[in-house]
Amino acid sequence: MAAPCFLTLRVATLAALALLSLGSSAAGHIEDQAEQFFRSGHTNNWAVLVCTSRFWFNYRHVANTLSVYRSVKRLGIPDSHIVLMLADDMACNARNPKPATVFSHKNMELNVYGDDVEVDYRSYEVTVENFLRVLTGRVPPSTPRSKRLLSDDRSNILIYMTGHGGNGFLKFQDSEEITNIELADAFEQMWQKRRYNELLFIIDTCQGASMYERFYSPNIMALASSQVGEDSLSHQPDPAIGVHLMDRYTFYVLEFLEEINPASQTNMNDLFQVCPKSLCVSTPGHRTDLFQRDPKNVLITDFFGSVRKVEITTEKISLQWDSQVVDSSSKEDGTAEERMGPLKYAEQLPVAQIIHQKPKPRDWHPPGGFILGLWALIIMVFFKTYGIKHMKFIF
C-alpha cells in the first residue's frame, strides 16, 4: 500500500509544479507586456500652436492656427495638452462682419473659432520670451497649469508656427523676432531636460525652410511651406471682409487632416505630398535627417492625435444586451434600433464637402453711395420745383 500511495503523491506533486510553472510563465508574459508598454518611448501627445501676427490684414494667420487647433482637438488631443498662442483676436475685431467667428473657407460655413476655443496666450502675451519659456519650461511659479507645456521624455510634441518671416527669422507682432539659432537652442534645451520623445515642427511663413536649417537636436522632423528665397502665398480672398482667409500650405494641410481619423494608418510621407508646387506656388520642404525613424513608419496620429492607453487584464468580461435598459431608454431618447446602429467618429461638420463646394451667391443690396445719391437727386428736384419755402413739408 505504501508504494501506490507514494506514487500517487509524487504524481500530484509533479502536476502541481507543472501548473505552478505554467501560471508563473503566463504571469511573467503579462508582466513583460505591461513593462514593455509602460517603458515605451511614446505615451502622450502635446501641441504648441503659435500665430505671431497682429492686425486685420493678417486674418489668415489666425485662421491658419485655429484650423490646426480644430484638427488636433478632433483627433483627440485635449485642451489640457494644447498651448494656443494668438497674437490678435480676429473674432472680436471691429472690422469682422460676423462677430465671434473666424472662417477658413469662402462659403462661410466652417467656423474654426467654434464655441470651445481656449486661448492660453493672447495679444501682447505672445512674445518671443514667453514662447521660449513655454518650450523650455522656465516659467514663473505663478504661471497657471494651462499656460505650461508639461511634457516629459515620453511626449511627442507638435509645434506649429505661422506669421511673417524672412531668411533665418520669424517676426512676432512686427516688434521683435526669433532667429533660427534661438529656436534650435531652445529645442536642444528641451532635449537635454528630457521634455520630448519626438518633435514635429511645422512652419508656414516666407522662407520657412531657413528656420530649421540650424536644428541639431535628435528626434526632430521639420516641415516648411517655402524654401529660402521664396514667399509663402495666401489663398481664398474674400471680398466681404477684404482679406485672404488662409495661406495655401495650411489650407491643403487642413484638407488632408480632415480625411484622417484616430484609427488612420496614414503616415508622414503622405503629409509631405499634400501641397506640391503646382498648388502652393512656393516649394514646400522637409527635413528628416535628425529623426531616427523612417517617415513611412510614422503615423500622422503619432503627433496630431491622442495616445490611446491599453490596460492589460486577465479577467473575462461577459457583455450581455440588457433589453430592459434599452426599452426604458428608448422611450426617452429614441428606438432601440437607432441605438444599435454603427457608430462613427464624431465630426462637427461635413468638412470635406464644405471645402469643395462653391460659395453661395450673395444677396444683392444697393450700395450706400447709391442710396445717398438717390436722396440727393430727390432733394435737388424738390428745390428746383418748389423752392426752399416748402422744406417744412419734408421734415
Curated annotation (Swiss-Prot):
A protein binds at C206, S232, S234. The keyword Membrane applies. GO terms for biological process: attachment of GPI anchor to protein; GPI anchor biosynthetic process; proteolysis. One of its GO terms (molecular function) is GPI-anchor transamidase activity. Residues 28-368 are lumenal. Catalytic subunit of the glycosylphosphatidylinositol-anchor (GPI-anchor) transamidase (GPI-T) complex that catalyzes the formation of the linkage between a proprotein and a GPI-anchor and participates in GPI anchored protein biosynthesis. Recognizes diverse proproteins at a C-terminal signal peptide (CSP) region that lacks consensus sequence and replaces it with a GPI-anchor via a transamidation reaction. Transamidation catalysis reaction follows a two-phase mechanism. This is GPI-anchor transamidase. It comes from Mus musculus (Mouse).
